Amino acid sequence: MLTEEKEDYLKAILANDGDTSFVSNKKLSQYLNIKPPSVSEMVGRLEKAGYVETKHYKGVKLSDEGLKHTLDIIKRHRLLELFLIEVLQYNWEEVHQEAEILEHRISDLFVERLDKILDYPETCPHGGIIPRNQHFEEKFTVSLLEFEPGDKVTIKRVRDKTELLVYLSSKNISIGNDVEIVTKYETNKVMIVKRNDIVTILSYDNAMNIFAEHV
């Protein structure tokens, strides 16, 4: 049986495209904010259990069994997030941590009932696709960083990063909102966006975790 820690590693691998390509341990270390030796040790355990495969100098990739299990975790997590917002009236920046706790403690039957009562939703509150039939492909994949000054875009997806969600909420920016790309500063690695004449500064790191499409 997988521990919560191992499941979090599997989700991190998938978040870095580890279903179709190899992810370096260094990248995982940065993503999880965990020291490289600890990452290497955990990857070894996951490989021994059959959830990942590794290749020297390339990194780690989910096995078929690992992908199946990871998609199940993500489905649980995203359904829980939606339930917490729609039924229990949580804010979108609050649900990620709650779902992280609950996703490991609910049965398959509970997930089925949750899915049904929510009418089989396509996306979570942050715009992420809810996996179905072992299929997973995010619908919105173009980050804000890829747009140019003057572009007007609609926010479609934001990664589950609590600090980023809190910041966006403080600026009244959410899924479905239109913003204009004002300028980008390569030297400082920040960009400025505007919504309803309110200016918001985003680091490039944050902008890479916000996905949009042209209005």
Predicted regions and their residues:
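Short acidic, hydrophobic short linear motifs in intrinsically disordered regions
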Residues: 19-27
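Mid-protein regulatory/catalytic core that forms ligand/cofactor-binding pockets
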Residues: 103-211
